[in-house]
Amino acid sequence: MEANSGASDRISRIAGHLRPQREDDVCLKRSDCRAKGGVSGFKVAILGAAGGIGQPLAMLMKMNPLVSLLHLYDVVNTPGVTSDISHMDTGAVVRGFLGQQQLEDALIGMDLVIIPAGVPRKPGMTRDDLFNINAGIVKTLCEAIAKCCPKAIVNVISNPVNSTVPIAAEVFKRAGTYDPKRLLGVTMLDVVRANTFVAEVLGVDPRDVDVPVVGGHAGITILPLLSQIKPPCSFTPKEIEYLTGRIQNGGPEVVEAKAGAGSATLSMAYAAVKFADACLHALRGDAGIIECAYVASQVTELPFFASKVRLGRVGVEEILPLGPLNDYERESLEKAKKELAASIEKGISFIRK
């Protein structure tokens, strides 16, 4: 009888993460668990981990050797995702958190918080529909971040990024925790697409291409600076028009290809992990980490703008200038700024109203 009791106790301890429980009901207390995971590294939380972006994002972050502890939070289905990913034989320890009542527990002590939470734009849904839902979600999550891990680097993926990053900034300002260096909108997917599409035109490996993409993260606010491509290359006006249009419309291209069954989830997860990995290397102290991101900026007259930034231990260490633009890029930039300004104001007004 004692042997059976011991076996049951061991099974209960091992399976403790499979379903959400109150701390006083759990056989294995949080204080008994490994504090930083199986390896030395950083503590990362994904808010919206059970969604279309969140699941592949969580899987890829579990594979990152710089992550020691991975917290997965969502309002539904977190136990299943946590159980599945926790079976991967990589160093990071995975813990799941389900529902609003466990949000703060998911955030305490985190070094990096990634926010893919929200709904994707679906056929028939207007931008206002998308904004009204996701704005409230981002507001709630950022209020908890301000309370539980105000020093964390925050990567915002939830669309519309042009508005949700200003929303996050206003929430942090109200809480007295705002540090513009630590708040970054993830525009890496635009860079990834630009590298891929340019490589297709040139007939080269996309890993050998680097295209800076500035402005914002929607439609004409996405401005690839093809004149600054590395390695240096010139394009015909027809090629510039084709590449710019395809990069700006990469999202709708995927939505159309999926025939209403989803949006760009896998490529977004890949891009988000690529950017998160850059942030973690910078937190570790690696030098020369430069990526494009949507941040509080003085590059233009707008309060937020996507451009190349140098990352460091505190987040954004330096915002790099735009560099020389050709006539096409200057004209496109002026168009982008008008739309971007309206999106920024919409986000700020959502909090201040």
Curated annotation (Swiss-Prot):
Protein name stated in the entry: Malate dehydrogenase, glyoxysomal
Chain positions recorded as substrate binding sites: R121, R127, N159, R193
Phylogenetic placement of the source organism: Eukaryota, Viridiplantae, Streptophyta, Embryophyta, Tracheophyta
Organism: Glycine max (Soybean)
Class in the EC hierarchy, top level: oxidoreductase
CDD domains assigned: MDH_glyoxysomal_mitochondrial
InterPro entries, per the entry: L-lactate/malate_DH, Lactate/malate_DH_C, Lactate/malate_DH_N, Lactate_DH/Glyco_Ohase_4_C, Malate_DH_AS, Malate_DH_type1, NAD(P)-bd_dom_sf
Gene3D superfamilies, A to Z: Lactate dehydrogenase/glycoside hydrolase, family 4, C-terminal (3.90.110.10), NAD(P)-binding Rossmann-like Domain (3.40.50.720)
Organism superkingdom: Eukaryota
PANTHER family, alphabetized: MALATE AND LACTATE DEHYDROGENASE, MALATE DEHYDROGENASE 1, PEROXISOMAL
SUPFAM superfamilies referenced in this protein's UniProt entry, alphabetically: LDH C-terminal domain-like, NAD(P)-binding Rossmann-fold domains
Subcellular location as annotated: Glyoxysome
Entry's EC annotation: 1.1.1.37
